[in-house]
Amino acid sequence: MQIIRAAATDTVKGNAAYEIHDKRKETGRQRSDRHDPEKAGTLSEEASLQRGRYGLAVDVGTTTVVMELYELISGQRLSGLSRRNSQTLLGADVMMRLMHCQRGQQAKLEKLIRQQLEEMAEEICAGFCEPEQVERIVAVGNTTMCHILLGQDTSGLSGSPFCPAYRGIFRCQGSKLGMKRLREAQVIVPAGIDAHVGADAVAVISSLNFMEAPGNVLAVDIGTNAEIALSSHGRLTTCSAPAGPAFEGAQIEQGMRGEPGAIAGVKIARQIGNILLDVIPGPGREPLFVKGICGSGLIDAVAALRQCNVIRQDGDLLQSPSEEKLPPFLAERITDKGFMLYQSPEGKHVYLTQKDIRQFQLAKASVQAGIEMLLRRQEITLAQVDTLYIAGVFGGHISKRNAVLTGLFPDIAPEKLVIAGNAAGKGAAQALLSETFLEQTEWIGSHAGHVELAQQEEFQQQFMDAMAIVPW
C-alpha cells in the first residue's frame, strides 16, 4: 500500500527557486519588509545613487540558475524564477564543462548561458519593466560558471596550479557579452576566492555576516559543487567539494527538480504497513500525479530504507526479500529495477535504484570529507563548531533528521544547525543594492584561505571512509 499526499505548504511555497513569485500588487512603500535582507536584500546608503530603477540578482549554479528582479531605489523584490542551467546539455558538472572548454566549445557554453539570462530577464520583467530598463545585474556562481559567463580563459581552472584568469570584482556592460535586450545593463560579478571557490561562496559568507560571528562557524553551500567555509575566530578557510548534481535531481534514474509531480518526502509507517509519499502538487486543484523524485525525496528515501535495512550501511540495496526479514509491504517492492517507491495504476512506477544510492553516497561523502578536511586544517573538532549553516536552494527543503541519519550533515546539537536558504542569492541581492556590500566581497576574496582538496593526500581516504550511510 501507499499513501500519497501533497507536500507540506512550506516545502512548495518556500521553494523560491522553482516558482515565479509575483508581487505586482505590492508597492515598495507598502511593504514593511523592504529593508529586510532576508526578504528584499539590503537598502543601502548608496541606493539613492543608483541611476536605474531595476536590477537583477542572479545565482548561476552549475545545475540551476536563479534570477530575482529588484526595484533599486526602494530595494523591493518584485519577482523571482529559476530554470535548469542550459549548459547541462554539455555536461552535468564543472569538470565536464571545463573539458568542453578545452575542446574548443567554450564559445558555445558562453552563448548558452547568456541567451538563457536574456530569456529569463524577459520573463521576469514582464508586467514590471522592459529588459532594456535593467541598469544593473549582479551575478554570482562558482569560478567556472563566472569565467564562462564573462568569456574569460578557463584553462587555468582545469589543472594544477589552478589559477583563475581574473581576481576581484569584474564589471562590464551587457553589450560586451553580446547581450541584446540587456546590452545597457552593467554586469557585475563579485570577487571569488580561488579556482574552485567562487563569487557564490563569497556571497554566502558575506550575507551570513560570517566574518563577524564569534567562535567557530561553518557554512556549507550545497549544490553540484559544495562550497565549504570555516571561520575560526575570524580566520577564514574554504574548499570546494565536487558533490555532483544528485541533490538537484540530476544523474538519478527518475530524478527531477523540485517541481509538480516530484516525490519530495518519503516515510515508512511500519505500524500501518504503508509508505507515505509527499508529492509536490500542481497549481490550483489539479489532482496529484507522480513523475519522479527530487533531491529532498532522495535523501528521505535513502534514510527510510536504511532504517528498515532495505539499504545496508555500505549502500547496497537488497536484491532479494529473503536477505532480510522484511514485512510483506516492503518485500513486495524489491524488484530487478530497484525499490518501487511509487506503484502507478498505469504502470509508470517510480523506483530508487542501486545507481541512485551510489550517486547519493558519492555526493554526501564529498561533502563530509570536505568538512572534515577543513576542520583538521584548523585543528578544530566537530564538537567545537558553534554554528553550522546549510545554504543553497536545495538545502532549505530537506529533513535535518534524515540528513543527519544518512551522514550528509554531521550529528551536532540541533540548535547549532541553521538552514540558511539560498544565501548566495541573498548575497547577490545585497551586492546589487549596496556598493559597500559589494566591496566587502573583494576584501573576503583576497583574505580567505583555500584548501585544494584534490592536492591533499589524505582526502581520497577520507572520502572513501565517508561513503558509509551512517551518522558521523
Set out the residue ranges of the language-model regions.
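Acidic, glycine/GT-rich loop-and beta-edge segments that sit at the periphery of enzyme/chaperone cores
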Residues: 1-10, 186-201, 211, 430-472
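Glycine-rich phosphate-binding loop of actin/hexokinase-like ATP-binding domains
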Residues: 61-62, 67-69, 75-93, 156-169, ...
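A contiguous, well-structured pocket-lining segment that forms one wall/lid of small-molecule binding clefts
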Residues: 306-378
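Glycine-rich phosphate-binding loop and adjoining helix at the ATP-binding site
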Residues: 93, 131-134, 148-203, 247-252
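Phosphate/ATP-binding catalytic cores across multiple sugar-kinase/actin-like superfamilies
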Residues: 116-124, 201-204, 208, 361-383
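N-terminal glycine/serine-rich phosphate-binding loop of ATP-dependent small-molecule kinases
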Residues: 1-148, 155-158, 188
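Phosphate-binding glycine-rich/basic clefts of nucleotide- and phosphate-handling proteins
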Residues: 110-147, 230-330
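Catalytic phosphate/nucleotide-handling subdomain of diverse soluble enzymes
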Residues: 232-234, 380-444
